[in-house]
Regions:
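N-terminal Rossmann-like NAD(P)+-binding domain of SDR-like oxidoreductases, especially those catalyzing
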Residues: 1-83, 162-165, 169
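Conserved active-site region of classical short-chain dehydrogenase/reductase
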Residues: 3-7, 91, 123-126, 130
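Solvent-exposed, non-membrane alpha-helical residues enriched in polar/charged side chains
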Residues: 6, 65, 98-99, 130
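Conserved sequence/active-site signature of Rossmann-fold short-chain dehydrogenase/reductase
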Residues: 31-32, 83-85, 115, 125
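A glycine/serine/threonine-rich, flexible loop-to-helix segment
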Residues: 38-39, 90-98
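Short, solvent-exposed loop/turn segments at secondary-structure boundaries
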Residues: 52, 87-90
């Protein structure tokens, strides 16, 4: 996966070629794991992933940073926050919640629903990606004359976390209004 992409980027400079101008890759808000501080910041510690998915996203960030440092490849990681919209992933909570409501089954909610999620519409994700693509991290040297890795990480979300119980209530109301539920 990402290792092969990074290797391709590295070798794009072979034989005096111009090479990759800017690698932009998808990461995830899942890297924040059990962090309690809200809002999340890219400066927050993300060393304790709570899933294999989060661990792979964090390892991708570490590899991209290493390649930026070792090979001076401009790279930017984008931590997406719960993306929704047309053609959304069927494993996302809102699809699962909708299916459970349609089947008359109970939705299992942890922590009494006292958690918040930042839902981000896919068009906003696309806008963020396009903006970042146009602005690669600058290649520059530090005071010691050595290159500073041209590497950045950004959070891409809507900056308005929703309470999970409120989300389920609104989902149910909208499904009733749309006559999907009785």
């Amino acid at each position: 996966g990402v290792y092969n992409i990074l290797e391709a980027c590295r070798h794009s400079y072979d034989n005096g070629e111009t090479g990759v101008e800017h690698l932009v890759y998808a990461s995830s808000s899942s890297v924040y794991g059990t962090n309690k501080k809200i809002p999340y910041s890219t400066d927050d510690k993300v060393d304790n992933p709570v899933s294999l998915y989060a661990a792979t996203k964090k390892s991708n960030e570490l590899m991209a940073h290493a390649y930026s440092k070792l090979y001076n490849i401009p790279s930017t990681g984008l931590r997406f926050f719960t993306v929704y919209g047309p053609a959304g992933r069927p494993d996302m909570a809102y699809f699962g919640f909708t299916n459970k409501l349609r089947e008359g089954k109970t939705i299992q909610i942890f922590n009494y629903g006292n958690c918040k999620r930042d839902f981000t519409y896919v068009d906003d994700i696309v806008e963020g990606v396009v903006r970042v693509m146009q602005h690669a991290p600058e290649k520059q040297n530090g005071e010691d004359g050595l290159p500073i890795p041209p590497y950045k990480v950004y959070n891409i979300g809507n900056n308005s976390p929703e309470n999970l119980l409120d989300f389920v209530t609104i989902l149910q109301e909208e499904l009733i209004a749309a006559k999907v539920l009785p």
